UniProtKB/Swiss-Prot annotation:
<keyword id="KW-0378">Hydrolase</keyword>
<dbReference type="InterPro" id="IPR036995">
    <property type="entry name" value="MPG_sf"/>
</dbReference>
<dbReference type="GO" id="GO:0003677">
    <property type="term" value="F:DNA binding"/>
</dbReference>
<keyword id="KW-0234">DNA repair</keyword>
<dbReference type="InterPro" id="IPR011034">
    <property type="entry name" value="Formyl_transferase-like_C_sf"/>
</dbReference>
<protein>
    <recommendedName>
        <fullName>Putative 3-methyladenine DNA glycosylase</fullName>
        <ecNumber>3.2.2.-</ecNumber>
    </recommendedName>
</protein>
<comment type="similarity">
    <text>Belongs to the DNA glycosylase MPG family.</text>
</comment>
<dbReference type="Pfam" id="PF02245">
    <property type="entry name" value="Pur_DNA_glyco"/>
</dbReference>
<dbReference type="GO" id="GO:0006284">
    <property type="term" value="P:base-excision repair"/>
</dbReference>
<keyword id="KW-0227">DNA damage</keyword>
<dbReference type="GO" id="GO:0003905">
    <property type="term" value="F:alkylbase DNA N-glycosylase activity"/>
</dbReference>
<dbReference type="InterPro" id="IPR003180">
    <property type="entry name" value="MPG"/>
</dbReference>
Amino acid sequence: MQAPPSFYEGDTLVVAKKLLGHKLVHIVDGIKRSGFIVEVEAYKGPDDKAAHSYGGRRTDRTEVMFGAPGHAYVYLIYGMYHCFNVITAPIGTPQGVLIRALEPVDGIEDMKLARYNKTDITKAQYKNLTNGPGKLCRALGITLEERGVSLQSDTLHIELVPEEDHLSSTHNIIAGPRINIDYAEEAVHYPWRFYYEKHPFVSK
């Protein structure tokens, strides 16, 4: 079952924690690639100095952040790595949640090919398959083509995981500072990164 539009509404910190344990799904050439979300970061622009939309900054890149919740915000870092975010909060409030890491579930062979151009990989390579925002986008085939796509689409969405299979039943959720935002002054210390304690696919 796909997460309904109402799932993405409300406080961004609440939505960030709600996303943990559910599946990010991308259908590529008819093949389902997915993973359990195990690490996220919340960004609460325009007051959050770590957010692309800090100060209400509105550009072609960030325009989707000002739209309806439940859409994909994809951007490129270092000119080569894609990052996938879920838009939250009401229209006109540019906030979102970065998906930082996944535990691979469906389409793992295709994900291996996408990341390493081979399926015979080492244990270390498998652990590195989706344990970072750029890595998971490469594995799932998420690019700038997905920017602005509704997460109600057949090909890109969040799939709700039943309570009995949910990782939150076996893992504690930890809150801490976000990663790689040294430029963000006091926002560096906001405990807006949420992840499953000791999960092997958490990025750090």
